[in-house]
Amino acid sequence: MTQPDRIQQLYQIIASLEDADQVRALFDDLCTVKEIENMAERCYAAKLLMEGNTYNQVMAQSDISSATLSRVSRCVQYGKGYSQLLKKE
């Protein structure tokens, strides 16, 4: 199985989970606590940006670095994933 196939398999596994408890159990096994915290911080920063907060406001309300915030901002502007955050709430 190629690396792209393994990545696709991971996406399919996550998509097949039924609730947040199952997702939490999988992420607890797959990721370190710090990796989960970093993903959560990126999602929070994306949400703040989508709500109209400035970089300075986001940095004041989160523990994200300016470099990571810049990447999150690009993904919010041009990507498709972060837009799901506000749709789910």
Residue ranges of predicted features:
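Eukaryotic endosomal/vacuolar membrane-trafficking regulators centered on PX-domain-mediated PI3P pathways
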Residues: 55, 87-89
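Short helix-capping/linker segments at secondary-structure and domain boundaries
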Residues: 52-59, 79
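General nucleic-acid-binding
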Residues: 1-15
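Short, solvent-exposed alpha-helical "recognition" segments
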Residues: 73-87
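Short, Lys/Arg-enriched anionic-surface-contact patches
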Residues: 22-42
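Short alpha-helical "recognition helix" segments of helix-turn-helix
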Residues: 57-62, 69
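Short, amphipathic alpha-helical "recognition" segments used to contact nucleic acids or chromatin
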Residues: 40-52
